[in-house]
């Protein structure tokens, strides 16, 4: 959000940009960054709450779906909660976007959804399939859904780089295998990928 919002405001100058999340502290911090910008609105809510989604989506044309339980150990430990957010939350958003006439929706996914080996990856794969199938679920509504799968986003919350930076003072960085490679993109590249999806999406 901290990267997507200013880049989108600068490039597209939308009439209204709504940040919808359940974390009031993060919203409070973002409000200070965009104080005085009437284009930016903040709504507390949860994708699990369908009624709140309907209210939040009133008059909205484009949606970026980034809500997820995404810390792998947390997803394994609180598995029911992970499913409620990542799967049921996706279903709620699909229904609400269709009913409210949203034009285009891009759901952010992960490389962990490809041949998943943990619950987080499995729920994101399920979410991806739901969004793709949403295109055949729209009926007469002119709503399109697409999914983009990120690699590791450098500097994002939960990525390996902030983790390494937090422990580098100890002088030892844990590497699973010295042959291991990770696909990385920058935060800015992640935003541009979403823009590209909005511009070129055919649904899927």
What does each model-identified segment do?
Residues 1-13:
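Canonical Rossmann dinucleotide-binding motif of NAD(H)/NADP(H)-dependent dehydrogenases/reductases
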Residues 13-28:
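Conserved glycine-rich Rossmann-like NAD(P)H-binding loop of the short-chain dehydrogenase/reductase
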Residues 21, 43-44, 84:
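Conserved residues in the N-terminal Rossmann fold of short-chain dehydrogenase/reductase
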Residues 25, 48, 181:
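Adenine-nucleotide cofactor-binding loop residues
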Residues 35, 41-62:
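Conserved Rossmann-fold cofactor-binding substructure of NAD(P)-dependent oxidoreductases
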Residues 42, 82, 105, 145-148:
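Hydrophobic/aromatic anchor residues within beta-strands of the central parallel beta-sheet
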Residues 65, 69-129, 133:
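Conserved Rossmann-fold NAD(P)-dependent oxidoreductase catalytic core, especially the SDR/UDP-sugar
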Residues 119-120, 125-202:
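NAD(P)-dependent short-chain dehydrogenase/reductase
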């Amino acid at each position: 959000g901290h990267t997507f919002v200013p880049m989108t405001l600068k490039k597209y100058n939308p009439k209204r940009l709504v940040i919808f999340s359940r974390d009031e502290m993060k919203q409070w911090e973002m409000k200070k960054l965009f104080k005085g910008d009437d284009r930016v609105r903040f709504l507390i809510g949860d994708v699990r709450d369908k009624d709140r989604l309907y209210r939040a989506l009133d008059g909205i044309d484009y949606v970026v779906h980034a809500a997820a339980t995404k810390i792998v150990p947390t997803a394994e430990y609180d598995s029911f909660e992970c499913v409620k957010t990542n799967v049921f939350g996706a279903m709620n958003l699909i229904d609400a976007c269709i009913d409210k006439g949203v034009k285009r929706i891009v759901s952010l996914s992960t490389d962990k959804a490809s041949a998943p080996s943990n619950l987080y990856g499995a729920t994101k794969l399920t979410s991806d399939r739901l969004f793709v199938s949403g295109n055949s679920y729209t009926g007469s509504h002119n709503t399109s859904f697409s999914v983009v799968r990120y690699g590791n986003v450098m500097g994002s919350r939960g990525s390996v780089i902030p983790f390494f930076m937090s422990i580098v003072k100890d002088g030892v960085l844990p590497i699973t295998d010295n042959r291991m490679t990770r696909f990385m993109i920058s935060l800015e590249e992640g935003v541009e990928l979403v823009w590209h999806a909005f511009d070129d999406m055919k649904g899927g």
